[in-house]
Regions:
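Membrane-embedded translocation segments of transport machinery
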Residues: 268, 280-316, 329
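Short, exposed interaction patches on small structured surface elements
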Residues: 27, 31, 105, 299, ...
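Hydrophobic alpha-helical transmembrane signal-anchor segments
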Residues: 1-16
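Juxtamembrane "pre-transmembrane" interface segments
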Residues: 149, 302-342
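Non-transmembrane, solvent-exposed regions of membrane trafficking/translocation machinery
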Residues: 25-283
Length: 342
């Protein structure tokens, strides 16, 4: 007689584990597309010296640009024709005011693609966890739900955190900071957030030597120099103080961009941001091409889990848990014994 595991596929009913239904927040994917489009146009307008007034995002699918001068209106239209009109419809009104609304077919396509990407990312993360014969599949009729079944998983909390972690890695040049408050950071600009910038929170242990780490804020470029899409791989490691950290390698395109950014900004800080929080902001001391390291206050397990989710890729949108059912090992063991006796 052989152990049942070698002969029978042991699902939740036999092995125990967890059954979950998740919803992909597809509005996130639309918002990211709109934010990226708006910032891309902002940068092009600055390079072309085309002055505009307010640039405002009104919803995940709509933004507005105002104050286009009549003398530059034709050039503005040409730029937005090239950069935006495949994805957005343009509306114009008096006074150089323009609104851009995402085309309905593009919104549907982006929502569907975000669910497909989320499903693939979850599959990779579950496989890295070493779960035997998991189920990751579309679920329900709304098109935005994913079924996950993990047989034999005992640490459900860890599995849930790994699955839902957005793992959005961004490397951004620091304009100012760290500062102890958002208000202090923006004082130099009259309390106003400069165009093309954002304030990101983080933790810093260098402001007061020997003191506990404290919350700080950084003013950084809104558009990232490097993102998780540029990663080739990531692994847990140790830093120079023998503390857990995560090292990463960039792909060819990422290495080229990283080399350009670091060579042109020696002496400046580069913020390493994960899910909207600065983990470290080292000073660029020389040109760097294909590798870097994320330091923080990680346990060994946290560093290993971070390496796992970075390797598997960032989620295109956040996830929420709609349903969770746990099947205990006692029920699973009873089911196996009943099958053998039958």
């Amino acid at each position: 007689m052989y152990p049942p595991e070698e002969k029978v596929r042991l699902g939740l009913d036999l092995k125990g584990g967890v059954h979950m239904v998740l919803r992909v927040q597809t509005d996130d994917a639309l918002r990211i597309e709109t934010e990226t489009s708006l910032e891309r146009v902002r940068e092009i307008l600055e390079v072309r010296s085309i002055g505009v007034g307010a640039m405002t995002m009104e919803s995940p699918t709509r933004f507005r640009i105002e104050g286009v001068s009549p003398a530059q209106d034709a050039e503005f239209r040409a730029i937005t024709d090239e950069q935006l009109l495949v994805v957005y419809r343009r509306e114009s009104s008096a006074g150089g005011r323009y609104a851009f609304e995402m085309r309905p077919n593009m919104a549907v396509s982006l929502r569907e693609e975000s669910v497909r990407q989320a499903l693939q990312t979850i599959e990779r993360r579950v496989n890295e966890l070493g779960v035997n014969e998991p189920i990751v599949a579309p679920h329900g009729v709304g098109g935005d739900q994913i079924l996950v079944q993990l047989p034999g998983v005992s640490d459900v909390a860890r599995a849930k955190e790994i699955i839902r972690s957005t793992a959005l890695l961004e490397l951004k040049l620091v304009e100012q900071g760290p500062a102890i408050s958002r208000e202090t950071l923006l004082q130099a600009n009259g309390g106003r957030l400069p165009d093309g910038m954002e304030v990101v929170p983080g933790t810093d242990d260098t402001l007061t030597p020997g003191a506990a780490p404290q919350s700080v804020f950084y003013l950084v470029r809104r558009v990232a120099a490097i993102t998780g899409r540029d990663l080739r791989t990531a692994r847990s490691t140790l830093d120079e103080y023998n503390q857990p950290a995560v090292s990463f390698l960039l792909n060819g395109d990422g290495a080229r961009k990283f080399g350009n950014i670091t060579s042109q900004n020696i002496g400046r800080q580069l913020a390493i941001i994960l899910d909207g929080r600065v983990y470290s902001a080292p000073v660029i001391e020389s040109r760097i091409t294909d590798e870097g390291r994320i330091t923080g206050y990680f346990s060994q397990e946290e560093a290993a889990d971070l390496g796992l989710v970075l390797r598997s890729g960032a989620l295109p949108a956040s996830l929420t848990y709609l349903e969770e059912r746990r099947v205990g090992p006692t029920l699973g063991a009873d089911s196996v014994r009943a099958g053998i006796l039958a």
